Amino acid sequence: MSTTLLQSDLPGLPLRHRGKVRDVFDIPRDRLPADAPPGDYLLMVATDRLSAFDVVLPDPIPGKGEMLCQVSNFWFHKTEHLMPNHLVDIRVEQVLPEGVDPALYAKRAVVTRKLKPVPVEAIARGYLIGSGWKDYQRTGKISGIELPDGLRQAEKLPEPIFTPSTKAAVGDHDENIDFDAMVKTVGAELAERVRDATLRIYRFAADFAAECGILLADTKFEFGTDADGRLYVMDEMLTPDSSRYWPADQYELGTSPPSYDKQFVRDYLETLDWGKTAPGPSLPADVIDRTRAKYAEALQRLAGISVD
């Protein structure tokens, strides 16, 4: 059984950012292996924290961080022929402070390049669901993209589409924007590179997932650039937290299909008299267990990795 980690504190590694799920640390040069290439590096730790409706909940999902990290690493390696990523060939145990148990971080942490984030969320959609479905019902468009009339909830789109959104701070909500707004934010050349990479990776991943009996409805990527302007995909990749995966045998047009994510949590929270603001309520044990099982099933079906 995995050890649960709600928050990581690593003396000697400056905390750069504590997000909803991940803790990110700067790695001082003297903690790197002597043969590490020049440049700045980060240690990214996937904790077992769980967020819903942009609020971090008090109860962790045991082993969730390890499962997310393993799914991400699987996809980073699977897609490196399509797009370079932030991973580097430095082992986690090489940079951990003395006295820290390497086993606690072995499956939930990675050493990465330190990149300049592109300040836009890159979203690919292959099916009409979620906020895209709501936008379509209201306007017939998603992020300014005209779609055919008469599409139904969860319907497969004629072609995958790129629908960027703002990158909100913790506790705030992302907002869908059109491509022109993205161009104004990051410039035309970078916007086109991000759009092309997003759709290229999505198509590849959707085809692979289909072979595993899973539909990849949509997914969100984050990108960053190095000092030379090279583009990398970063943060997490095609995890149940950043993607909407549906069991193909349970897909039904006109409904919101079950997914490999925290839907059990959202459904439970919707039954409560809670204003969807911090602090979040505690979760019953059965909701935690069922959510963990969904993450574990996604890891096994996609990457062939079983957990205890």
Swiss-Prot record:
* Disulfide bridge positions per record: none
Q: Please tell me which top-level EC class this enzyme sits in.
A: ligase
For the biological process aspect of GO, one term held by this record is:
'de novo' IMP biosynthetic process
Q: Which Pfam families match?
A: SAICAR_synt
Q: Which GO molecular function entries does the Swiss-Prot or TrEMBL record give?
A: ATP binding; phosphoribosylaminoimidazolesuccinocarboxamide synthase activity
- EC number(s) in its UniProt entry? 6.3.2.6
Q: Which reaction does it catalyse?
A: 5-amino-1-(5-phospho-D-ribosyl)imidazole-4-carboxylate + L-aspartate + ATP = (2S)-2-[5-amino-1-(5-phospho-beta-D-ribosyl)imidazole-4-carboxamido]succinate + ADP + phosphate + 2 H(+)
Q: Can you cite an annotated GO cellular component? A: cytoplasm
Q: In which pathway does it act?
A: Purine metabolism; IMP biosynthesis via de novo pathway; 5-amino-1-(5-phospho-D-ribosyl)imidazole-4-carboxamide from 5-amino-1-(5-phospho-D-ribosyl)imidazole-4-carboxylate: step 1/2
Point out the coiled-coil segments of this chain.
Answer: none
Q: Which CDD domains match?
A: SAICAR_synt_Sc
Which UniProt keyword terms apply here?
ATP-binding, Ligase, Nucleotide-binding, Purine biosynthesis
Q: Which domain of life is it from?
A: Bacteria
Say yes or no: keyword Nucleotide-binding present: yes
PROSITE patterns from the UniProt entry: SAICAR_SYNTHETASE_1 (PS01057), SAICAR_SYNTHETASE_2 (PS01058)
**Family, per the entry?**
Belongs to the SAICAR synthetase family.
| Record-given protein name | Phosphoribosylaminoimidazole-succinocarboxamide synthase
**Native organism:** Xanthomonas oryzae pv. oryzae (strain PXO99A)
- Name of the gene encoding the protein in the UniProt record: purC
